[in-house]
């Protein structure tokens, strides 16, 4: 009888433990599934204090679900995580998901950042989406030669760019800890993904073609089975800095309708506590959130046509004389590609992806129609 009771208690204990483990597994699987399927919209916060962060969060929390803490002083200069923790707590309590910018995880930069990231998922659960690692890796290569100074060929430049970033201490650290890695950029999206980034935000700013930015970033993410988004950023170097409310609303709609998983409004420290965002921009954001809520079941625009660039051809494509890998001047292929891109963008708009002739991917299976870079296009 005693043996039967003991066996019964053991059986009950096993069932309870099994149920608990299963429940925890299902909870995290459901959380991951939910964030996988969600659309995220929010602000990239570029200021430096808890007070200012709370002001922005209170302003936008009813029509956003994402907050990016994009502040070098908060995540790198501070000697401890107190400020960052308070902002993350406030964002999570406001029912916002959040991403945190870090410049590096080397101990010489700081001694708390590594531990903070390791503990973040436990502290905030699914609200912590990942790390925004540095900024504009492709753009910095073009403007500063940040990754590679010299190379003998386009293929060598590609290999050096990808290997330098992918094997860096910070990228390696995040990958080993299974932390999703984000960045934003305006060139070389495909090579950002190859370097280890899980999500890249295409920068909608200046006079850059939105169709081209979408085609390059969405096309790269599709080839590599990654996520993509758009960040609405600088239009001017002086006030008002950003486009009008009407202009940024149009950019948000373009990104959302084209299938972006993330749409972000860039903000930056300036004279007032709300940075460069004005009431006009907040009204446009609220209007966009209403559009998203009303069109959540609307089928997104999927690319049907692909324009195939030569492999390793890291041309900026912002203007006809743009650099290649930030090292070489435009070559004989550049003018052909420029002309063809203009024709295809006019004809197909957001139905166009711009991808690379990488032999490891079956490109033709993914699109109804493809054009190689030097095709004759009428």
Which residues make up each language-model segment?
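N-terminal Sec-pathway targeting helices
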Residues: 1-18, 22-27
């Amino acid at each position: 009888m005693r043996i039967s009771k003991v066996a019964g208690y053991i059986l009950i204990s096993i069932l309870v433990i099994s149920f608990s483990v299963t429940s925890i597994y299902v909870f995290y699987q459901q959380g991951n599934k939910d964030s996988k399927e969600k659309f995220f919209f929010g602000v990239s916060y570029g200021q430096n204090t808890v007070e200012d962060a709370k002001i922005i969060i209170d302003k936008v929390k009813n029509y956003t679900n994402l907050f990016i803490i994009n502040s070098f002083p908060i995540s790198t200069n501070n000697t401890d995580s107190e400020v960052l923790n308070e902002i993350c707590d406030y964002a999570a309590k406001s029912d916002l998901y959040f991403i945190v910018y870090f410049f590096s995880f080397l101990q010489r930069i700081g001694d708390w950042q590594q531990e903070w990231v390791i503990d973040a998922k436990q502290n905030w659960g699914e609200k912590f989406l990942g790390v925004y690692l540095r900024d504009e890796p492709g753009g910095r290569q073009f403007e500063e030669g940040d990754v590679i100074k010299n190379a003998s060929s386009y293929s060598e430049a590609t290999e050096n760019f990808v290997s330098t970033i992918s094997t860096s201490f910070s990228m390696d650290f995040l990958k080993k800890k299974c932390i999703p890695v984000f960045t934003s950029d305006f060139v070389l999206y495909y090579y950002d993904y190859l370097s280890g980034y899980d999500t890249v935000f295409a920068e909608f700013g200046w006079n850059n073609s939105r169709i081209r930015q979408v085609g390059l970033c969405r096309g790269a993410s599709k080839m590599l089975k990654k996520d993509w988004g758009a960040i609405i950023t600088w239009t001017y170097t002086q006030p008002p800095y950003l486009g009008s409310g009407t202009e940024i609303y149009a950019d948000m709609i373009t990104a959302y309708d084209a299938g972006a998983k993330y749409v972000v409004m860039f903000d930056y420290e300036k004279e007032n506590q709300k940075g460069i965002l004005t009431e006009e921009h907040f009204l446009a954001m609220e209007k966009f959130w209403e559009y998203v809520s009303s069109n959540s079941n609307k089928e997104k625009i999927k690319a049907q046509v692909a324009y195939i660039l030569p492999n390793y051809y890291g041309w900026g494509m912002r203007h006809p004389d743009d650099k290649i890998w930030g090292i070489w001047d435009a070559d004989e292929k550049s003018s052909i590609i420029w002309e063809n891109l203009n024709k295809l963008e006019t004809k197909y708009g957001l139905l166009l992806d711009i991808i690379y002739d990488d032999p490891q991917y079956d490109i033709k299976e993914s699109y109804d129609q493809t054009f190689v870079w030097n095709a004759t296009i009428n």
